[in-house]
Amino acid sequence: HHAIHRLLPIAGSYQQALLDDVAQAYTVYAPEEAESIFNRGNQAIEDIKGHVSGIRYNACKMREANRKVSELEDMHAKAVMYHNSVKPYMDTLRFHIDQLKHILHVA
């Protein structure tokens, strides 16, 4: 939770800065350089958007699965269901968090 709550606002700010850079590229740079900045900026914006969506979706699904697991009484059944139901969302969530950290250059 902590990583998500810290990372998403940073992603939003970074995405806004990229949008500003892309919008200003053609007024500041030569056409060829502006196009390159525009293309790189748009790709980064799309990548950020995809990873933020992946984080939100998988965090929600993981919470839902975790609620179902916590209702079980039997510890073995809990462990099996956690492994089968919660962990896959956790792994995908970790992937999106790591990718977003890489894009944002955040440790």
Q: What is the meaning of each model-derived region?
A:
Residues 1-107:
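C-terminal amphipathic alpha-helical interaction region
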